[in-house]
């Protein structure tokens, strides 16, 4: 097949970028790489199109060259194309160099046995050193850009194979002295130097003259493949944190340098640092990272080499440079920073963080630096925050958190406030009016007050619990803070029991300093307030988490009172989970009486079976065996006794086990008929199920409770009828249905599973009015139209139309509700919305791109829902 045209390539590239994995799995994926390499030599394609093809190979080398042989062949072809370019200026030389380098590095083909590596490395080194390769390779005008590209390619190869350029250190150092402070060359030398120091230290060898050796003195070329093999662990050139101290002790500290090598190393580092101010801020930061890592822990190399850079950068406004400077502070400490330097830097960070015009990410960065400033680290016992050495309340007065701050900024400022609270008692003794601890208590009270708003946003509750966890973590050893925190959280639960899942999660993550008193407070709160029926499930969920052997009588009294209100399966299961928790806690006699009462009182057979099983276990097993029987079954060891195994299977058969959902439910096409809206559910069967019962719960109070749907049997591969779920809306609004399945498996086990929630759309509630007599349709509609006012409302909007026009849109979405039709430009539509609302539409004078719609309804809350529905009709198709 001949070369592809420009339009064909543009289409293929667009399809590939839309989904690379799908394209490569298709019929054209296998030939994409081969066609790309072939058409790079075609004279029919323009250079911009060839550059676009090379850009694709740079972005997706793993998809184009998935293994080492393919990468080797691709790099060879790219190098051949580079050599065959005419000597005139071309925009392809630099992308070809980058593409060949990327193919070898990403495909794992960079090794001494690779022919493409043997061709590419000398070419890159020749270009990097400025050696004249002849006018036949490239014109003089391209030599300088190609040299910079060669430096970048060598840095990429050194990053992939640390130690590869260890033999080129002397050459690169001499080249830096000759070429001046070129940014890619400086970064290349710094990376190669860092890698060589780390690898030689692990090998227990010195630098062995690597800093002074020239290219002519190297046997077998400048490529140190042995050093690269020893450095197979890929080192991050800009690591987010410094190596651990124990790594230094067995790493760079073991490097033995001769006096001459130490002198040459200092000269090389000084050479790089002295000209670093000419680099971009990002490049300067990376250079400081590399050199700081290389010299940290290296004996005989004082960090005073960085002092001129420190003086220069103390006033920097560049975040990357500030971050690198703080890394040097963490690495070298007092050996590099004086007390005056630390105070100045801390004051700069504090004042910068208070700037009112800072973007949120920058503000969070400054706060992060303050929180991780070495002199602000905790100095007390493990797990406790101690007084910071330099950070004081006067300095941080402008950084105190407020309820008006963004959540992330509030939490960061709160962490800073916790650092200051450890000195609270001392400053209170000196007569301070408003201590940090008092400010902290007021802030937490404000967060709890916002979280207690019934129906408030979930984000406010989440922020309150995040702040509570942060305070408990930072001030675990401060009872004066934890006691009011515990009391406040108990009051929050009293005001809004629906936050029970948040409380359970908090109890799972906090330490015992807050966990134990909070458990007691919440247990007392639940036991003393049975609550209304809608709050009962939250009380039971909370009690299942906090119940133990203490306060047995109050807990059992609460459960007896709650049992009368547990009428559905979900509440009964929640009640039994509390009983299970009490069983594991070792609660005795009173629980046995309660279980007997539940076995007689509960209406659901599953709940009765559970109550009887728990009573039998309590009556016949001692405490340790009872704990094992009620423990998780997944970690149970295999038992050799067939009798015991049979008993285990019998116990499992009596219990309802949670399992992955065996079916998938989706909402099918609706039919506007009947007295109530009916949701048609499509079923996809994954596993055979028997006696399936689907239970639906509406989130919120928008709908009346929904009945269960029963199906005797479902098997994969057999056609299934849609399941009909009648809806009883209390208000005409969309809803979200939580779905739970209870079923039997072919092996006889009873299981339950949670299915993904179902969404009831606004249009799923549409019902038609009774058909008026023939000839009376217009009068019927006008009577409905007039009856909506004055108690209702009306509006007008523009409904965009697709290319098929108004007639097709009405036929597809509104045909059952049309009362009067004058196609294709006018329709009168009447929709009945349960329980007792109506929505009337006049679609008249349709135009090519849309139709004006007049709406009337007797329920003003329907208006925004109707507007959203109409505006989305054209997009729905």
UniProtKB/Swiss-Prot annotation:
GO terms for biological process: endosomal transport; protein transport. The keyword Transport applies. GO terms for cellular component: AP-type membrane coat adaptor complex. InterPro entries: AP5B1 (IPR038741), AP5B1_barrel (IPR048980), AP5B1_C (IPR048981), AP5B1_middle (IPR048979), AP5B1_N (IPR048978). Keywords: Protein transport, Transport. Probably part of the adaptor protein complex 5 (AP-5), a tetramer composed of AP5B1, AP5M1, AP5S1 and AP5Z1. Interacts with ZFYVE26 and SPG11. PANTHER family: AP-5 COMPLEX SUBUNIT BETA-1. As part of AP-5, a probable fifth adaptor protein complex, it may be involved in endosomal transport. This is AP-5 complex subunit beta-1.
């Amino acid at each position: 097949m001949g070369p592809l045209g420009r339009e064909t390539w543009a289409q293929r590239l667009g399809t590939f970028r839309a989904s690379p994995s799908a394209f490569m799995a298709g019929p054209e994926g296998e030939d994409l790489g081969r066609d790309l390499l072939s058409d790079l030599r075609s004279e029919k394609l323009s250079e911009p199109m060839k550059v676009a093809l090379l850009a694709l190979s740079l972005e997706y080398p793993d998809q184009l060259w998935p293994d080492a042989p393919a990468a080797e062949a691709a790099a060879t072809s790219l190098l051949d194309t580079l050599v065959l370019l005419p000597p005139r200026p071309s925009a392809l030389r630099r992308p070809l160099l980058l593409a060949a380098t990327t193919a070898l590095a990403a495909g794992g083909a960079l090794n001494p046995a690779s022919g493409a590596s043997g061709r590419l490395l000398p070419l890159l080194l020749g270009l990097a050193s400025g050696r004249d390769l002849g006018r036949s390779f490239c014109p003089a005008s391209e030599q300088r850009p190609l040299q910079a590209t060669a430096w970048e390619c060598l840095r990429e190869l050194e990053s992939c194979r640390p130690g590869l350029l260890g033999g080129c250190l002397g050459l690169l150092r001499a080249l830096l002295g000759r070429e001046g402070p070129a940014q890619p060359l400086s970064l290349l030398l710094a990376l190669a130097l860092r890698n060589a120091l780390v690898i030689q230290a692990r090998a227990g060898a010195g630098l062995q003259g690597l800093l002074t050796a020239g290219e002519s003195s190297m046997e077998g070329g400048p490529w140190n493949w042995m050093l690269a093999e020893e450095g197979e662990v890929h080192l991050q050139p800009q690591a987010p944190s410094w190596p651990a101290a124990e790594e230094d002790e067995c790493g760079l500290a073991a490097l033995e340098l001769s006096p001459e090598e130490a002198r040459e190393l200092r000269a090389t580092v000084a050479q790089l640092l002295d000209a670093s101010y000419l680099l971009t801020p990002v490049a300067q930061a990376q250079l400081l990272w590399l050199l700081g890592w290389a010299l940290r822990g290296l004996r005989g190399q004082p960090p005073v080499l960085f002092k001129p850079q420190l003086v220069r950068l103390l006033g920097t406004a560049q975040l990357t440079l500030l971050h690198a400077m703080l890394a040097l502070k963490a690495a070298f400490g007092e050996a590099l920073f004086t007390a005056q330097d630390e105070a100045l830097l801390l004051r700069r960070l504090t004042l910068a963080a208070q700037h009112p015009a800072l973007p949120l990410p920058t503000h969070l960065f400054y706060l992060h630096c303050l929180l991780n400033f070495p002199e602000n680290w905790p100095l007390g016992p493990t797990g406790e925050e101690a007084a910071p050495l330099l950070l004081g309340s006067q300095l941080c007065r402008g950084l105190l958190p407020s309820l008006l701050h963004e959540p992330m900024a509030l939490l960061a400022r709160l962490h800073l406030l916790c650092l200051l609270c450890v000195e609270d008692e001392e400053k209170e003794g000196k007569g301070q009016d408003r201590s940090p601890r008092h400010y902290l208590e007021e802030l937490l009270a404000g967060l709890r007050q916002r979280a207690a708003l019934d129906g408030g946003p979930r984000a406010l509750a989440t922020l309150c619990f995040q702040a509570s966890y942060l305070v408990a973590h930072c001030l675990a050893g401060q009872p004066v803070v934890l006691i009011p925190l515990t009391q406040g959280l108990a009051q929050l639960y009293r005001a809004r029991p629906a936050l029970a899942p948040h409380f359970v999660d908090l109890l799972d993550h906090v330490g015992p300093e807050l966990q134990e008193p909070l458990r007691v407070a919440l247990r007392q709160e639940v036991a003393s307030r049975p609550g209304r029926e809608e709050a009962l499930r939250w009380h039971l969920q909370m009690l299942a988490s906090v119940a133990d052997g203490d306060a047995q009588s109050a807990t059992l009294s609460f459960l007896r009172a709650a049992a009368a209100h547990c009428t559905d399966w979900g509440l009964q299961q929640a009640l039994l989970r509390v009983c299970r928790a009490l069983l594991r806690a070792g609660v005795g006699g009173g629980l046995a009486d309660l279980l007997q009462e539940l076995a007689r009182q509960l209406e659901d057979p599953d709940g009765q079976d559970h109550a009887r099983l728990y009573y039998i276990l309590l009556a016949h097993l001692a405490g340790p065996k009872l704990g094992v029987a009620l423990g998780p079954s997944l970690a149970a060891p295999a038992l050799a006794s067939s009798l015991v195994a049979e008993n285990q299977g019998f116990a499992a058969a009596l219990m309802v086990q949670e399992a992955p959902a065996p079916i998938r439910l989706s909402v099918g096409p609706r039919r506007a008929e009947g007295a109530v809206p009916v949701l048609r559910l499509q079923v996809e069967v994954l596993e055979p199920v028997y006696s399936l019962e689907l239970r639906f719960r509406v989130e919120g109070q928008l709908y009346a409770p929904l009945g269960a749907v029963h199906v005797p049997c479902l098997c994969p591969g057999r056609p299934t009828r849609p399941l009909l779920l009648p809806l009883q809306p209390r208000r005409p609004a969309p809803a979200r249905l939580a779905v739970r399945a209870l079923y039997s498996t072919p092996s006889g086990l009873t299981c339950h599973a949670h299915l993904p929630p179902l969404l009831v759309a606004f249009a799923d509630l549409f019902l038609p009015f009774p058909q008026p007599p023939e000839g009376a349709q217009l009068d019927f509609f006008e009577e409905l139209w007039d009856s909506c006012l004055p108690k209702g409302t009306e509006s007008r909007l523009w409904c965009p139309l697709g290319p098929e026009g108004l007639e097709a849109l009405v036929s597809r979405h509104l045909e059952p509700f049309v009362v009067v039709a004058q196609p294709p430009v006018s329709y009168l539509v009447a929709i009945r919305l349960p329980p007792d609302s109506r929505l009337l539409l006049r679609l008249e004078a349709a135009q090519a791109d849309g139709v004006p719609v007049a709406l009337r309804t007797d329920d003003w809350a329907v208006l925004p829902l109707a507007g959203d529905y109409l505006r989305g009709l054209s997009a729905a198709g």
